Amino acid sequence: MRNDRPVRITRGSGDLYVYATGITTLSTNFPDDLGKSPSTLPEISTASMSALSFLYSQLFVEPPVPTHDFQGQTVIITGSNRGIGFEAARHLLRLNVSRLILAARSAEKGQIAADTLEQLTGRSGVIQVEELDMANQESVQEFATRMEMCRIDAVLLNAGIYTHDFVWADNHESTLTVNVINTFLLAILLLPALRRSSKTWVIQPCISFVASDRHVMYDLPEWKTQNTFQVLNDRQQARMHERYPISKLLEILLARAMAKQLDSNPPNGTGNIIVNSFTPGYCTSGLIENVHGITGFALWLLSKATARTTEVGGRTLVAAIAQGDKSHGKYLNDGHIDESALSPFVRSQEGILAMEKLWEELMEILEQKRPGIGLLLSPVP
């Protein structure tokens, strides 16, 4: 006889009843009291529910194969020479994308990826390889300049790093630089090209930030300090084992802030630029190759037990840029809009206050990198 009791998880159109004794035990046995009202079932902590929700998504949900037609469209993917970025590129080629810009830190590796994609899909003359080092603001600004006159229908901001080593890059801890600061530097610098594309081709471009469901693990108490980024840049205080999920929490909050900023500065006579963020789920990729020791081993075990393939993860990238304006300012999970998958902190009033404060801090940092960048958030009359 089991002493633990069932917990009900609702995701999408279905319910899952599991036994929870903490956050590690998962069973799909159906108990005798399955028919009881959910209100009679025991409550568990937010952390436990988040873990169970994650397991449900990883084990029982498979994002659908995308079918949206991208004919005539140009899509940029950062971090596209391997992993889910590479698989998203393969899906887009299958879905008739007319121009695919692969942005990779190494032009050589980017070209190898392009050659492989052409062989796999039989499509040639579609891929354009561009060098982009997200750890270097000059590389980011040069890339944005090269894109100024391009038609751009969608930007998938997928490039990111996962490391437990505290390393400086562009005057900030490298995870913050790559996953957050320079990612938003690029997003804002591309706005003029996106607005030009919107007006010229009567389209509604999309910027999509690849986040992570691991953002639910932390509530970022540092947001209450005078300068959050300064605290996160303190080597002595840095908790690097938390840095990746914290960077993704920052990315989600700031993506929502950016969407709000664009809403307050709508363009004249054209549709708004769509901004969203999403989780691809936990996928087998090279992202954790720089994580070693017991944490690396734990992540390896988790990958073996629950991880999606990069092909399945790549589906979520394509889904994020195919949702249309209904996804503006929203969060996607398993390939569809799912605000309930956000952490309680993000959805709380405290989360909104943190979002507004962090946006101000981010813009101060970006103004130092590119004076006047804030003006790009408002369209030219």
Curated annotation (Swiss-Prot):
Originating organism: Penicillium roqueforti (strain FM164)
This chain's function reads: Highly reducing polyketide synthase; part of the gene cluster that mediates the biosynthesis of annullatin D, an alkylated aromatic polyketide with a fused dihydrobenzofuran lactone ring system that exhibits potent agonistic activities toward the cannabinoid receptors. AnuD does not seem to play a role within the pathway.
Sites binding NADP(+) sit at 84, 109, 133, 158, 244, 248
Q: Name one Pfam family in it.
A: adh_short
- What protein name applies here? Short-chain dehydrogenase anuD
Q: Tell me which residues this entry annotates as catalytic.
A: 244, 248
What InterPro entries is this protein classified in?
A: NAD(P)-bd_dom_sf, SDR_fam
List the Gene Ontology MF annotations in alphabetical order.
oxidoreductase activity
Q: Does the keyword NADP apply?
A: yes
EC number in record: 1.1.1.-
Q: Which UniProt keywords apply?
A: NADP, Oxidoreductase
What family is it from?
Belongs to the short-chain dehydrogenases/reductases (SDR) family.
TM ranges are none
Disruption of the gene: reported phenotype: Does not affect the annullatin D biosynthesis pathway.
